[in-house]
């Protein structure tokens, strides 16, 4: 009897313990402040790396003799390991400018005796010899650094990484005339950029501007904030008023001018924000309320900030949030009497995605919810997710997020179907984010959405796509990196602007007529239109030579535009039947008298982009490529089924701007996984597209295989039908998967595919496609407890 009672007692204790774990699973908690043993006998700041590196947290202190003292801690309190970075033969004080941290290395940029140096710390755990870098364009003898500490930054997409070094050039507007003070934008700083980790630096200086009212900012600190640059200014002045701090977010870039403004996150008017960061799926902030500093955070990452407060108050300056190991964030700050403190914050990671709550409970499992969105007939309830906050798949090829839905709520067929053309019927749109069910329980299902990171090269920033649920709620994904964008109707100080490759240009007009709005653009410029009074142009990725043109803007004045030569050609395997893109080797001029063209795609690296340009206005004119393609007997099939998998992605058809006529481009992208599968299958994919050129139907055959070379493919083609075994061998035989109506495009079904195996191992959100893994700790923990329980039971 005693044994039975003991078993029951152990069981109840375990249940109670597990329930407690469940209730505190996503609660943000903290430890009381502790003084660290890190000290600095100079007046300069201690600069911390923004995240741990190889299990350690690093602090950087500038000293005499051109020395940077690098301290390391594991627990945030005891700084026991110290290394020096030093330039010999110099007695001046070293000043830290930038610290970049990735999975593989730390990059330190510092200044001494008006020279800039760069040094790197990698897997050998030693600093490289400091190397002088030429950033003389940004040097100012009387200016102070705008210190950056963070990840490698992303511009326009996930692939374009850069580092920067900046000087504080915020001007003193106190003794200037009113007209100068009322200027719309004010200079914050000047930065130099490198896209190869400091080996080469761009000649152009990137200016930071703000449209917020201030007269001077004494100290600028920069950090990454979900793909953008966050500016933290302290000891700011606005005429005769002193402002303790100012927080700005930079997102618009043009002509190497980066424009910063107040973030969309808002606090109450009686609260001032001293610091703000985004770490480990939380917004974290230090706020000042009635002369008291408090720690605040939010569970919901949507645009509104409804903060929760941690029950701690403190005084100090130079606050640094640092992402530490074991799901912790350390807050370091400088207190009174030159003492340094740390507050440890437990931030349990959540799933990136949306939680459809049926009551007013706080979302602690997912990063977004529908709770704060006002629901009315004009605006459906929406959960908005920025692409820069999404996590990567374990192979680094996809962006992922999850949505938890009650079992009676379904994903509809028009989920995440998108088009660059506002006038196109949605049945011709392209499914750009695909779904699969990863967890199916009695009361709810979890649906995972995924799309390739390559999309961020094509789905331009601040463009969004949405999914409608069966209850009319919406999930919105915004592609939101720092972008190269200019609005020609924005009030400029000049009537002349420069435009560069890949820039997005908005132009509004009073009368939407084709004749009055014909302009000369570089070859390969795309055009979109979301409103009847406005057009947007995405300048070609490659401008062969410079030229000029003029635009009539809304004020009916002339804007002179100079297109600057430069950029990079992309290589698309396919053909341009309009000769309107710089990215194709084959064009209309390459055609012989034959109306059939064979494209052999057999030379592969790790990926491949396949393209087709046809002189039509839209899919209405019969352009079936690449969402649906033709196979033999003019049979129309879905591209996913042709490749035998659901990880094939098509870029929505885009309209290429032409002064005469029109052209549409469709792109099919094959990533590493797709290529590997084709190699393993030893198969050849064949399909064709048709295009009407000057009343002649041209048939373009695509033969795709990374396993066979072009000669082998031709040999297979020349065989008799019954002998051909390698071509399209993965096409399903089910009739419902093959469409015979070649007069219209049938939309792809987007009903979530149920995945039988467990969820794939995924990485946490980061701007680098590499970080710690989620291993399903709860399941492992329960398994361990179960084993212990069974062991005790056996013992008894």
Swiss-Prot record:
Task performed by this protein: During the asexual blood stage, recruits host complement factor H CFH to the surface of merozoites resulting in the down-regulation of the host complement alternative pathway and thus, protecting merozoites from complement-mediated lysis.
Annotated knockout phenotype: In strain D10, causes a loss of binding of human CFH to the merozoite surface resulting in a 7-fold increase in host complement-mediated merozoite lysis.
Example of a GO biological process term: symbiont-mediated suppression of host complement activation by recruitment of complement control protein
Name of this protein: Merozoite surface protein P92
Pfam families attached to this UniProt entry: s48_45 (PF07422)
Keywords: Cell membrane, Disulfide bond, Glycoprotein, GPI-anchor, Lipoprotein, Malaria, Membrane, Signal
Signal sequence, renumbered to the chain: 1-26
Glycosylation positions in this chain: 27, 37, 65, 71, 168, 240, 275, 359, 502, 511, 607, 633, 728, 765
Organism taxonomic ancestry: Eukaryota, Sar, Alveolata, Apicomplexa, Aconoidasida
UniProt main location, coarse: other
């Amino acid at each position: 009897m005693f044994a039975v009672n003991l078993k029951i007692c152990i069981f109840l204790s375990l249940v109670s313990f597990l329930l407690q774990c469940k209730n505190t699973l996503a609660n943000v908690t903290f430890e009381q402040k502790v003084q660290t043993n890190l000290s600095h006998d100079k007046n300069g700041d201690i600069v911390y790396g923004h995240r741990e590196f190889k299990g350690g947290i690093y602090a950087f202190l500038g000293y005499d003799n051109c020395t940077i003292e690098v301290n390391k801690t594991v627990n945030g309190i005891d700084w026991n390991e110290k290394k020096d970075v030093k330039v010999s033969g110099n007695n001046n004080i070293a000043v830290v400018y930038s610290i970049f941290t990735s999975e593989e290395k730390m990059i330190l940029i510092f200044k001494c005796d008006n020279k800039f140096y760069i040094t790197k710390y990698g897997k050998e755990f030693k600093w490289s010899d400091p190397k002088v870098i030429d950033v003389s364009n940004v040097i100012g003898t009387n200016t102070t650094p705008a210190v950056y500490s963070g990840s490698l930054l992303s511009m326009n997409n996930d692939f374009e990484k850069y580092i920067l070094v900046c000087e504080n050039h915020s001007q003193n507007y106190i003794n200037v005339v009113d007209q100068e003070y009322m200027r719309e934008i004010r200079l914050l700083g000047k930065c130099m950029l490198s896209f190869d980790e400091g080996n080469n630096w761009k000649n152009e200086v990137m200016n930071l501007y703000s449209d917020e009212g201030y007269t001077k900012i004494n100290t600028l600190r920069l950090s990454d904030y979900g793909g953008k640059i966050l500016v933290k200014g302290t000891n700011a002045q606005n005429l005769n008023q002193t402002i303790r701090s100012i927080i700005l977010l930079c997102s618009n870039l043009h002509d190497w001018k980066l424009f910063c403004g107040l973030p969309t996150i808002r606090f109450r008017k009686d609260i001032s924000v001293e610091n703000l960061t985004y770490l480990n799926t939380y917004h974290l902030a230090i706020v000042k309320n009635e002369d008291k500093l408090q720690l605040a955070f939010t569970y919901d990452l949507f645009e509104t900030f409804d903060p929760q407060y941690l029950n701690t108050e403190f005084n100090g300056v130079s606050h640094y949030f640092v992402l530490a190991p074991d799901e912790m964030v350390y807050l370091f700050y400088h207190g009174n009497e030159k003492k340094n403190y740390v507050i440890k914050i437990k931030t349990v990671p959540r799933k990136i995605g949306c939680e459809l709550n049926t009551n007013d409970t706080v979302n602690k499992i997912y990063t977004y919810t529908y709770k704060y969105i006002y629901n009315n007939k004009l605006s459906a309830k929406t959960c908005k997710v920025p692409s820069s906050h999404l996590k990567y798949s374990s192979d680094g090829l996809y962006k992922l997020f999850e949505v938890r839905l009650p079992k009676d709520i379904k994903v509809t067929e028009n989920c995440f179907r998108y088009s660059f053309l506002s006038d196109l019927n949605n049945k011709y749109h392209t499914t750009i984010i695909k779904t699969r069910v990863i967890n199916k329980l009695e009361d709810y299902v979890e649906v995972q959405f995924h799309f390739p990171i390559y999309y961020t090269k094509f789905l331009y920033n601040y463009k969004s796509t949405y999914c409608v649920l069966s209850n009319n709620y919406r999930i919105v994904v915004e592609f939101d990196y720092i972008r190269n964008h200019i609005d020609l109707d924005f009030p400029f100080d000049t009537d002349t602007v420069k435009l560069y490759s890949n820039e997005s240009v908005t132009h509004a007009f009073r009368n939407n007529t084709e004749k009055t709005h014909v302009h000369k653009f570089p070859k390969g410029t795309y055009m979109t239109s979301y409103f009847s009074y406005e057009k947007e142009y995405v300048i070609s990725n490659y401008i062969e030579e410079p030229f000029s043109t003029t635009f009539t803007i809304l004020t009916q004045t002339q804007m002179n535009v100079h297109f600057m030569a430069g950029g990079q050609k992309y290589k698309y395997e396919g053909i341009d039947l309009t000769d309107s893109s710089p990215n194709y080797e084959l064009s209309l001029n390459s055609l012989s008298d034959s109306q059939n063209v064979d494209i052999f795609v057999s030379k592969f690296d790790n990926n491949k982009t396949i393209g087709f340009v046809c002189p039509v206005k839209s899919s209405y004119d019969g352009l079936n490529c690449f969402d649906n393609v033709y196979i033999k007997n003019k049979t129309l099939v879905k591209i996913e089924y042709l490749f035998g998998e659901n990880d094939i992605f098509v870029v929505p058809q885009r309209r290429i701007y032409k002064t005469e006529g029109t052209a549409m481009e469709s792109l099919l992208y094959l990533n590493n996984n797709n290529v590997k599968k084709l190699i393993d299958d030893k198969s050849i994919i064949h399909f064709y597209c048709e295009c009407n050129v000057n009343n002649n139907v041209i048939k373009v055959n695509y033969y795709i295989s990374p396993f066979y070379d072009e000669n082998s493919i031709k040999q297979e083609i020349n065989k008799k039908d019954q002998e051909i075994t390698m071509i399209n061998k993965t096409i399903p035989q089910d009739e419902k998967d093959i469409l015979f109506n070649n007069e219209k495009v049938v939309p792809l079904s987007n009903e979530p595919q149920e995945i039988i195996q467990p969820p794939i191992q995924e990485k946490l959100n980061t701007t680098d496609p590499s970080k710690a893994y989620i291993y399903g700790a709860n399941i492992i923990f329960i398994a361990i407890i179960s084993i212990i329980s069974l062991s005790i039971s056996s013992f008894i």
